[in-house]
C-alpha cells in the first residue's frame, strides 16, 4: 500500500478562521484510487513548526508527503524556508520557477509587472527542487525527493509543496501530484456501498461490523449515527472495498452489503436507502451510482 502524509501550514487553520477543506479534498481524491492519507499534521506559520512537522512525517518513511499552504509572497509564507531547514538545504533563486511566474503574468495580461522582492520570493526554492506549473495562480508548486531509511531499507519520499489557495492547490494536485501517485499505486478499483438504516442503533450492529471486518480485513466499514427520527434510530453505514480487479472489488462489497442487509432485518431494522458507487461494469456508460437494494437487477 502506498503511504501518503500531509503537512498543512497556516495559523488560520488553527484559530478557527479557515476550515481545512484542502486536506479533505485531497483525502477524497486519494481514497477514490484506493489510497488513504495516514496522517495529517497542521502547524502554524513558523519555521520551527514547519521544519519539525515535516521531519516528524518523514521519520515514518512515507512514499509521499503533501505540504499545503505558505507559498505566497507575504512574510508569513515561509513554508519553503521551513522545508529547506528540515532537509538541510539552502533556499536559492530558481530560474524555472521565475520563468513560470513571468509566464503567468503574461498569460493574465500583466506582462510588464515589475519583479519586486515579494514576487521573486515565490521563485526561491530549496536546492534540488523542481517547480510545478500553477495554471490559475502565481506561486509555483514544488516537488523534491528526500532520501531516508526505514529499518534497514533505504527509502525515497517525494515531497510536494502546494499553495493553500484551494483552486490553485487543486489545479497543481490534479496536473502534477495525482498522476505521480497513481503511477506508484497502479490501477485500483474502489467499490462503495452506503446504507441508510432505520430502526437499529449503532451499538446493535457493532458486533456485526466486527464480524464483517474479520471476514473482510482489507475492507473499510464504518457506521455513523444520525440520531432519532420520529422516535426511531437512524444509522449510516459505509462499506468500501479496493482491489486491483474490478469484479473482485464489486463482488466483495456486494457480499458485505448482503451480510448487513440480513443482520439489519434480523434486528428489526430496515434499509431506507442504499447507494452504490463504482460498481458498474467497465463497459457501462451510465452513472456509477444507484440506489437499488442488494441483489436487485440494475440496468
Regions found by a protein language model. Give the residues of each.
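Proline/glycine-rich low-complexity loops and linkers
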Residues: 42, 49, 77-184
Amino acid at each position: 500500500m502506498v503511504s501518503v502524509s500531509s503537512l498543512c501550514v497556516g495559523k488560520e487553520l488553527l484559530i478557527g478562521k479557515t476550515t481545512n477543506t484542502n486536506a479533505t479534498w485531497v483525502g477524497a481524491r486519494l481514497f477514490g484510487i484506493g489510497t488513504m492519507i495516514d496522517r495529517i499534521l497542521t502547524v502554524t506559520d513558523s519555521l520551527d513548526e514547519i521544519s519539525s512537522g515535516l521531519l516528524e512525517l518523514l521519520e515514518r518513511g512515507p512514499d509521499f508527503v503533501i505540504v499545503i499552504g505558505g507559498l505566497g509572497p507575504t512574510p508569513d509564507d515561509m513554508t519553503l524556508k521551513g522545508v529547506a531547514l528540515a532537509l538541510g538545504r539552502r533556499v536559492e533563486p530558481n530560474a524555472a520557477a521565475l520563468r513560470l511566474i513571468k509566464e503567468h503574468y503574461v498569460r493574465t495580461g500583466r506582462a510588464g509587472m515589475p519583479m519586486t522582492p515579494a514576487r521573486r520570493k515565490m521563485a526561491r526554492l530549496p536546492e534540488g527542487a523542481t517547480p510545478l506549473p500553477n495554471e490559475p495562480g502565481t506561486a509555483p508548486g514544488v516537488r523534491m525527493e528526500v532520501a531516508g531509511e526505514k529499518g534497514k531499507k533505504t527509502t525515497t519520499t517525494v515531497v510536494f509543496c502546494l499553495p493553500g489557495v484551494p483552486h490553485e492547490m487543486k489545479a497543481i494536485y490534479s496536473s502534477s501530484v495525482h498522476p505521480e501517485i497513481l503511477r506508484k499505486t497502479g490501477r485500483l478499483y474502489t467499490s462503495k456501498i452506503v446504507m441508510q438504516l432505520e430502526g437499529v442503533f449503532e451499538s446493535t450492529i457493532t458486533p456485526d461490523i466486527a464480524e464483517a471486518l474479520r471476514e473482510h480485513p482489507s475492507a473499510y466499514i464504518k457506521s455513523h449515527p444520525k440520531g432519532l427520527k420520529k422516535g426511531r434510530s437512524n444509522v449510516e453505514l459505509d462499506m468500501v472495498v479496493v482491489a486491483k480487479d474490478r469484479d473482485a472489488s464489486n463482488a466483495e462489497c456486494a457480499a458485505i452489503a448482503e451480510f448487513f442487509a440480513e443482520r439489519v432485518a434480523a434486528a428489526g431494522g430496515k434499509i431506507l436507502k442504499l447507494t452504490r458507487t463504482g460498481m458498474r461494469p467497465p463497459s457501462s456508460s451510465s452513472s456509477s451510482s444507484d440506489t437499488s437494494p442488494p441483489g436487485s437487477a440494475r440496468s
